[in-house]
């Protein structure tokens, strides 16, 4: 793990394929050690700040449990718990927290915010999610894929992302494919494709590593032979209802359902989702979607697929913690370098 100590984790393309692979190997080891009761605390005495301008269940719990497992202490700064960007600049916040903490996690808005924190904090800064990238999620996804296709290299795997690919998930998947050589297919209406410049950059790297990146509106063509089908929510509570109708009309044909799974032609195809998922009407938003748009069986994924044996979403959720732990150990512990 040489080279990781005191390094930031802001986006995947900041790393080499070998570095990404070593992080995944460390995550797998830490997971095995935890389950066997042999985990060694390498972050004893470390203090970690968790800045959340956007709430999250999985990201917060993953960082907190990972830190506690490794002997570190955390301070949670929620959406109303800090003055960042309001009464105090990001630059000043970084310099204050950097004097008190050994590492800082940021989950919030623009990528420029986490980049500024990293520039001025003087300690490792980790991107828990920004509008542009979600690198910790992709680490968990890659570990989960390795676990479910043991013995297969990434450049022998086909990953399909169906839905709105313009977001941080689509961008981070492009970066993951660039580093691993995945056969990545973004199956989405053209209006929901990522920026062309990032696609071009990542496709060139993916091809050098034995993979490819394809963008298509054709569902049947896009999912053929897939090993994994991935999706994410189409709307959020913070958006105007007018956007809900527009987004649902645009993406309705890209819902992950049993027909899409069958179109892969792969009886072993697995379903991935970064969660939370609107697969039923048991949530406030899910109920609204069902009532207003007739999406009673699920929105971006049907309940049938979500609850099927093909669904490995809770393996993914668990792996958030193990991979985040690997990032913290690699960047904060001299014992691991």
UniProtKB/Swiss-Prot annotation:
Biological process, per Gene Ontology: arginine biosynthetic process via ornithine; citrulline biosynthetic process; L-arginine biosynthetic process
Alphabetical keyword list: Amino-acid biosynthesis, Arginine biosynthesis, Cytoplasm, Transferase
EC number: 2.1.3.3
Pathways per UniProt: Amino-acid biosynthesis; L-arginine biosynthesis; L-arginine from L-ornithine and carbamoyl phosphate: step 1/3
GO cellular component, one term: cytoplasm
Residues at which L-ornithine binds: 168, 232, 236-237
Transferase recorded as keyword: yes
One function term, GO molecular function aspect: ornithine carbamoyltransferase activity
Highest rank taxon of the organism: Bacteria
UniProt KW Membrane keyword: no
Pfam families associated with the record: OTCace, OTCace_N
Reaction(s) catalysed (UniProt annotation): carbamoyl phosphate + L-ornithine = L-citrulline + phosphate + H(+)
Subcellular location: Cytoplasm
PROSITE patterns: CARBAMOYLTRANSFERASE
Positions annotated to bind carbamoyl phosphate: 56-59, 83, 107, 134-137, 274-275, 320
InterPro entries: Asp/Orn_carbamoyltranf_P-bd, Asp/Orn_carbamoylTrfase, Asp/Orn_carbamoylTrfase_sf, Asp_carbamoyltransf_Asp/Orn-bd, Orn/put_carbamltrans, OTCase_ArgI
Major location (coarse): cytoplasm
NCBIfam families attached to this UniProt entry: orni_carb_tr, PRK12562.1
UniProt family annotation: Belongs to the aspartate/ornithine carbamoyltransferase superfamily. OTCase family.
Role played: Reversibly catalyzes the transfer of the carbamoyl group from carbamoyl phosphate (CP) to the N(epsilon) atom of ornithine (ORN) to produce L-citrulline.
Name by which UniProt lists this protein: Ornithine carbamoyltransferase
Originating gene: argI
């Amino acid at each position: 793990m040489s080279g990781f100590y005191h390094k930031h984790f802001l986006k995947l393309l900041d790393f080499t394929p070998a570095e990404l692979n070593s992080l995944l190997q460390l995550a797998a080891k830490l997971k095995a050690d935890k389950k066997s009761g042999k985990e060694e605390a390498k972050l004893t005495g470390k203090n970690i700040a968790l800045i959340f301008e956007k709430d999250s269940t999985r990201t917060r719990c993953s960082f907190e449990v990972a830190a506690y497992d490794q002997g570190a202490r955390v301070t949670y700064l929620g959406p109303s718990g800090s003055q960042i960007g309001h009464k105090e600049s990001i630059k000043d916040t970084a310099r204050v927290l950097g004097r008190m903490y050994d590492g800082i996690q940021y989950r919030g808005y623009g990528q420029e915010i986490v980049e500024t924190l990293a520039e001025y904090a003087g300690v490792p800064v980790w991107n828990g999610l920004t509008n542009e990238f979600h690198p910790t999620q992709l680490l968990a996804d890659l570990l989960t894929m390795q676990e479910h296709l043991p013995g297969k290299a990434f450049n022998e795997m086909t990953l399909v992302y169906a839905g709105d690919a313009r977001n941080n998930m689509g961008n981070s998947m492009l970066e993951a494919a660039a580093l691993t050589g995945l056969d990545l297919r973004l199956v989405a209406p053209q209006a929901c494709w990522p920026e062309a410049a990032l696609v071009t950059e990542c496709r060139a790297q993916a091809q050098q590593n034995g993979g490819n990146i394809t963008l298509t509106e054709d569902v049947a063509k896009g999912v053929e032979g897939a090993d994994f089908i991935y999706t994410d929510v189409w709307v959020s509570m913070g958006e105007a209802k007018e956007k809900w109708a527009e987004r649902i009309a645009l993406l309705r044909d890209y819902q992950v359902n049993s027909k899409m799974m069958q179109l892969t032609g792969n009886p072993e195809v697995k379903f991935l989702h970064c969660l939370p998922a609107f697969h039923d009407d048991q949530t406030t938003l899910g109920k609204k979607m069902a009532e207003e748009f007739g999406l009673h069986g699920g929105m971006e994924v049907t309940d049938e697929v979500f609850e099927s044996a093909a669904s490995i979403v809770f393996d993914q959720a668990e792996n958030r913690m193990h991979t985040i732990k690997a990032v913290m150990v690699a960047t904060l512990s001299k014992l691991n370098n």
